[in-house]
Amino acid sequence: MRLVSTVLDGPDVRALAEFYRDLLGWSYRPGDEPPPPGEPDPRGEDWLVLRGPQGRQLAFQQVPGLTPSTWPDQSVPQQLHLDFAVATVEELQAEHDHALRLGATVRLDRTDDPDEPLWVFADPAGHPFCIFVAPEQA
């Protein structure tokens, strides 16, 4: 058995997929690309898949009315989070700026940690994700 995809629920599947496509530079699964402006988007109303290196997939499932996580406050706990590694502190800062431009919000700043500098963000649907320095994993 093997893990095929990590799936994120969200109230706007297309917007969430576009956020991660821009953040990671991944591509849509054939047929999941956005339609031309003004055209209907039936694929973006339910389920979309992004594909990355080595066959990795990140999928998005429409869940109307999803309540975003409030982590680190536990009133609406996270169910999962994504970890992304970069090789240097300079890359960490560049990815921080990139994530904010795309609509992420900062949840935690631990960039002063000498062993593992990191940022914790929330994506536009409220899912927490981390970007941290780990040269051996980047």
Task: Report the location of each language-model feature.
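Vicinal oxygen chelate
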Residues: 2-5, 32, 48-51, 58-60, ...
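Short hydrophobic/aromatic beta-strand micro-patches
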Residues: 7-9, 83-87
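Core segments of cupin and vicinal oxygen chelate
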Residues: 7-58, 101, 109-112
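Short alpha-helix boundary/capping motifs
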Residues: 10-11, 89, 116
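Conserved, structured core segments of small domains
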Residues: 49-75, 84, 90
